[in-house]
Amino acid sequence: MKILIQLFFVFTISILYSFQGLNIDKNNQDWIQIFNGNDLEGWKVKINGFPAGEDKFNTFKVKDNSLVVSYENYDHFKNYFGHIFYKNPYSNYRLRLDYRFVGNQCKGGEGWATKNSGVMIHSQSPESMEINQEFPVSIEVQLLGGIQKPWKRTTANLCTPGTHVNINNRLVTTHCMSSSSETFYGEEWVNLEIEVNNDSIIKHYINGKEVFSYTNPIIGGQYNTLKDKKGDRLKEGYISLQSESHPIEFKNIELLILQ
């Protein structure tokens, strides 16, 4: 009888672990690759000074399974701020990717744009942007790289082109705010994850650690080209990756839809 009880216990534990394994596999399957690593299918470029879909200098390209922001065809940056948008808008999701800054900044780039890029969320569409519009109305998860030790330069910060947010239940109109992340000085890959919950709470993670959170994104403030929507809550929008004059690479770009 004692042996039977032991066998039953082992069998039950085995079944539980099997189900846990199935659940883990299911969760992994829920992540959608929105960049296939081969081409830019499903993505559209918008460069300041040009209509949506036109990338005169081939800024965004694919190399070694990474989405690469390159300035090899630029003589001078000339404020050609750009973004590449994924085709669908989203509201509730987790976005994760790896990124790294590489090489030297393009000639003519702003000093503040050295090792500077971003992931835009809750963004307006590329088609709705004006020809001469540097940044989409959006929430920017700002990516920065360290330039020289010991000067700290956090990443996964918050910038708000045409938007405002609440922090600790207070409306914040400051354009850029620093996260609590560490500084990455080299060309190492850094893992970024963003949790977006409609017009409620948004969280930034670096290498698995939460480094910033805020709530209640709305339209308004500096860089707002949607004047008729001032004060509207941002409940959904497009995802885009930024080109601000410093080469950067992105890979493993995946999305998990939340209920």
PLM region spans:
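Carbohydrate-interacting regions of secretory-pathway proteins
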Residues: G21-Q259
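Bacterial Sec-dependent N-terminal signal peptides
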Residues: M1-K26
